[in-house]
Amino acid sequence: VSAVEQSAFGPFFTVEAHAADETPTPPWRSVSGLVDGSPSLGGRISAVRSSLAARMAKTAAEVDLRVAASVTHLGLIARILAPTIAAATRGVRISQAPDDLWWQDRLGGPFPLSVLKTESGQREGECSAVPGAAVESITRCVVGETGVSDRVLWGNVGSAANSAAQLIAASRPALTGAARDIADTYLRDPRVDGGVLRAGPDFRRRSCCLIYQLAEDRTAVCGDCVLETRTGATG
């Protein structure tokens, strides 16, 4: 999938590409830095926590660390899975090895992401690395860093996969089936709500990403949340 085709699905799908023999230079950094025990992940969570606090006119200490951790995790995972799923619908596999993914640590929207240049012809659904090393490693490290429930975080993985499929379907209806099939390779993972959910407009996760706690309003939940009701959702 070309960069132009990817970007047509939305900003979360836009990627740059680098060769295997290239080394990231600032502001680029390897995703491996988020999962190697360095301060990068904790720093990202702290920055998100401060940003959320500023938006809610609170202090950082007033934002539950678990909420900031879940928001951080969902943002990272959604950014990685969106282009991965889009590429896979066209038969292209994007490596999810942390060393093969570069990112720029920015807030305020989808951060820049660069992926390893790959050859066409291998579908992500045919690859054994599903959900993928980056997804698994980031999820494990967020749990270790903050103690947030792994059920919440794997629910985030499901939400990210389904959201990517829905955005692709909305932009390119002809790819609806392919996008949902690829998303389902993630949703079948037993860590994602038992592996029984499937992609589509009726997707409803069995956990909450905790974002509603920022508004202190139980009705301010995402449309795919276990807490969502038809009369009380905000999207």
Task: Tell what function each PLM region has.
Residues 205-230:
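Local cysteine-cluster metal-coordination motifs and their immediate loop/turn environment
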